[in-house]
Amino acid sequence: MRVVILGSGRGSNAEAILKAEQEGRLGGARVVQIFSDQPAARILELGARFGVPAQFLDPGPFKTKFDEAGETRYLETLQACQPGLIVLAGFMRILKPRFVGTFPQTIINLHPSLLPCFPGLDAIGQAWRRGVKVTGRDPQSDQRLPPPPARRSRESVHPGWPWWFPTRV
């Protein structure tokens, strides 16, 4: 299966996926491309490290969504990659139904909270400031919020943990 990763930041989830591929733990799936909507994102450095093409792809002028031209640019570029799976690994853009509908049952979003709690930016920080006792991660593969419970990952929050620790559990 051909995997394309989209990310906006440092790429810790992308790195974990690439390491799993290197170790033969992806069942024959292979990452064929990394794209970022941020020209200086550290996720782009992973390409050279793991031998995967990585490039900035202009999303348009908005901070958290695509303009029409940017969405079209992404859709056409992704279609050319012929992905069997698109992983949103810290990709900080809201995808419209047109985008998701172009790749039905192909996109998975790794979101660092139990949705619908703490959507959007800084989900882990939001949960920490709220003082939650349980947090987790939701892999989304469609537009449903929250995702089906079988896909959720729950973690207890322990006193004394730094705010970012649940991202490493």
Regions found by a protein language model. Give the residues of each.
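One-carbon transfer enzymes
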Residues: M1-V169
